[in-house]
């Protein structure tokens, strides 16, 4: 056996958190290199550990919540609710950062910047500001030092993955590749140029739609000349999260039920286009990221997490949903194998039986009674228990559907 290479104070901090929460398996792995089949603590303890370990691990947990092909439902549910409790940085630190590193001189760019953030997270915080032109904008500022922390934690995750690769679990799930995917995704979120590009792509795609009235759905405009890796400046949208919105405003001749139906239809059409036409979608449309604007339009915000579906995957997913509606267990099993990234020896009979059991609950339901996010999560669970590796994009696809059902 061998132990992990030293990683300075950060490694010691991690071991202290693991010891205080009683995760003996991971503590043994980090200190002595003891390799055995992974033993995961309860969902509650795992989320507590991730929060205490800080921004990188919070993001890691949020990414794991999109992978029901890797973890059982109770872990997915706990990780989905994972939120950072990071206090905002004081205005003095933000102001100093803006003065030193903002792309343009502050006095020439802004009339004012509000010192109190409107939101703060593990990677950055957002301040409202007014440009010299009179336009109101949102400035997202990256936390100083976050890059160094993420780089250190990424190296530790890589070392842990190389140890876990010696286990059956690690081999079944190609754990080294998986760890690399996760760390690259977190690092991408640190680059606000990337989020700006995602935002702009969604805005462009949805502006030219024929599936709905593009004037009714807003994606914030990016101010490219004021945006770089550390700062993201977006159009300010005056609204509130959809679930707290007063749908009687602005006044109209439509009642609440009609407005709710219009909103549901608009969201369905917007995401149908993203998922099945464009293959590029906002992967985190929870109710807090769908705003009801003062003028009655909808807006999608926080476009930092996106998913991609290639044409073949989109076609297979469509066929899978049709097979489930038709209660065709054999076809579901065939499509699961086709969607898998790599297939060793598959017990096809067992796979088909798993689908027969799953489909029983849908025998007497009409199409309108189907919970399609639950259906996709079931499909990913079946893939997991049959040791079939599916593309990571399918986890984001399932998360997107689940969030939409929560918003609607």
From Swiss-Prot:
Record-linked InterPro entries: ABC1_dom (IPR004147), Kinase-like_dom_sf (IPR011009), Prot_kinase_dom (IPR000719), UbiB_kinase (IPR050154)
Q: What are the protein's GO molecular function terms?
A: ATP binding; protein kinase activity
Q: Which SUPFAM superfamilies match?
A: Protein kinase-like (PK-like)
Q: Which CDD domains match?
A: ABC1_ADCK3-like
Q: Which domain of life is it from?
A: Bacteria
Coiled coil spans: none
Pfam families recorded for this chain? ABC1
Which family, according to UniProt? Answer: Belongs to the protein kinase superfamily. ADCK protein kinase family.
Task: Quote the protein name from its UniProt record.
Answer: Uncharacterized protein slr0889
């Amino acid at each position: 056996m061998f132990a992990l290479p030293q990683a300075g104070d950060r490694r010691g901090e991690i071991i202290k958190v693991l010891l205080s929460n009683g995760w003996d398996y991971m503590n043994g792995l980090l200190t002595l290199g003891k390799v055995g089949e992974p033993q995961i603590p309860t969902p509650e303890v795992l989320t507590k550990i991730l929060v205490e370990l800080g921004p990188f691990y919070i993001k890691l947990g949020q990414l794991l919540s999109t992978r029901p092909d890797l973890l059982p439902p109770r872990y997915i549910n706990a990780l989905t609710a994972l939120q950072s409790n990071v206090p905002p940085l004081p205005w003095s630190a933000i102001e100093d950062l803006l003065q030193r590193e903002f792309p343009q001189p502050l006095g020439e760019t802004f009339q004012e910047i509000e010192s109190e953030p409107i939101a703060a997270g593990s990677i950055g915080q957002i301040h409202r500001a007014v440009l010299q032109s009179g336009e109101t904008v949102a400035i997202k500022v990256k936390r100083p030092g976050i890059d160094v922390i993420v780089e250190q934690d990424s190296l530790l995750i890589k070392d842990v993955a190389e140890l876990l690769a010696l286990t059956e679990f690690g081999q079944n799930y190609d754990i080294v590749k998986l760890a690399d995917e996760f760390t690259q995704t977190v690092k991408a979120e640190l680059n606000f140029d990337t989020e700006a590009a995602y935002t702009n792509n969604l805005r462009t795609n949805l502006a030219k739609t024929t599936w709905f009235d593009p004037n009714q759905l807003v994606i914030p405009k990016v101010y490219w000349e004021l945006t770089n890796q550390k700062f993201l400046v977006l159009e300010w949208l005056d609204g509130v999260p959809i679930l707290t919105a007063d749908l009687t405003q602005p006044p109209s001749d439509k009642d609440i039920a009609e407005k709710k139906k219009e909103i549901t239809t608009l969201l369905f059409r917007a995401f149908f286009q993203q998922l099945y036409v464009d293959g590029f979608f906002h992967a985190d449309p929870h109710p807090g990221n769908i705003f009801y604007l003062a003028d009655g339009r909808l807006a999608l915000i926080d476009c930092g997490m996106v998913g991609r579906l290639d044409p073949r995957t989109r076609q297979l997913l469509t066929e899978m949903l049709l097979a489930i509606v038709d209660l065709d267990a054999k076809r579901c099993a065939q499509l699961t194998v086709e969607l898998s990234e790599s297939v060793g020896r598959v017990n096809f009979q067992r796979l088909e039986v798993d689908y027969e059991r799953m489909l029983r609950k849908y025998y007497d339901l009409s199409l309108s009674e189907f919970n399609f996010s639950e259906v996709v999560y079931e499909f990913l669970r079946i893939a997991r228990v049959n040791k079939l590796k599916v593309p990571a994009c399918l986890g984001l696809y399932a998360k997107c559907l689940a969030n939409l059902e929560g918003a609607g």
